[in-house]
Design a protein with these regions (language model features):
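Charged, non-catalytic interaction/linker regions at domain boundaries
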Residues: 1-134, 204, 212-218, 222-243
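Short, hydrophobic/aromatic alpha-helical segments in well-folded domains
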Residues: 122-125, 138, 180, 187
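Generic hydrophobic alpha-helical scaffold/packing signal
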Residues: 127, 143-144, 163
Length: 243
């Protein structure tokens, strides 16, 4: 059960609360899905499990894109409350609460957080779609909404920004992400223009991974107070390219 209330005109407040609930559900879908990249799986229950929550330290540097057969299932309290006095570094529920904190906090409302919300909504739509092509397209749109400015060639800007945001600092890593993103986005254009494009599962997983990592990187930089607006993000990426 999600209970959300907003002040103001009753009808407008109701619509705002409905939209807030949808976005929170999308964020839970996002968090639940990306947990597989951290070598564990989040299982959300509809009954009380707080007495059986299992703590786990998470290393955010050791990511995995491959499917794992030995996933560990952990029960997680998704109440986003402060009721449990557990060290935030050892409780996985608290860790993801920390990760998504800026998106759920109205006091940090700005253009960059709006981009994050939109991108997570597209990620969630991709998870809920049963069509590979549609899921792929939704992720591509999420990448566009997060990392393009609309000023120059979308493919070039999107590929560069993805590479400088999520790749390692060495040239080869950035070139790999850049070239991969260019190839993926070419397929997005083919789908959008009615071309006979058939997306493979590995291509969907790749662009979905890029979108997830882009979202996480930006949230981490907001948390570290390195960027606080879309203008800051653009400046950061430009400095990475030309600094």
């Amino acid at each position: 059960v999600i209970e959300i209330s907003n002040l103001g005109d009753p009808l407008m407040a109701k619509e705002k609360s409905k939209n807030d609930a949808k976005e929170l559900i999308n964020q839970i879908i996002f968090i639940t899905h990306i947990s597989k990249s951290y070598k564990f799986h989040i299982q959300v229950h509809t009954y009380e499990v707080k007495d059986r929550i299992q703590p786990l330290c998470v290393n955010y540097d050791e990511l995995s894109t491959s499917a794992l057969s030995d996933e560990i299932i952990y029960n997680v309290d998704f109440s986003f409350s402060q009721r449990n006095n557990i060290d935030s570094l050892s409780n996985i529920g608290s860790k993801f609460k920390e990760l998504c904190f800026p998106i759920l906090t109205n006091s940090f409302n700005n253009d960059l957080l709006e981009k994050l919300r939109v991108s997570i909504n597209w990620y969630s739509a991709s998870i809920n779609s049963e069509s590979l092509n549609e899921s792929f397209l939704f992720c591509a749109i999420g990448m566009e909404s997060l990392l393009t400015t609309g000023r120059d060639s979308i493919t070039k800007v999107l590929a560069e920004n993805t590479a400088f945001l999520i790749a390692k600092d060495d040239i080869e890593s950035r070139k790999l992400v850049y070239n991969t993103m260019c190839n993926l986005y070419a397929k997005r254009s083919g789908i959008a223009h009615g071309g006979n494009i058939n997306i493979e599962t590995k291509e969907l997983k790749q662009i979905r991974y890029y979108l997830a990592m882009s979202i996480i990187k930006i949230i981490s930089k907001i948390k570290a107070d390195e960027i606080n607006s879309n203008k800051d993000l653009i400046t950061f990426l430009d400095n990475q390219k030309f600094g």
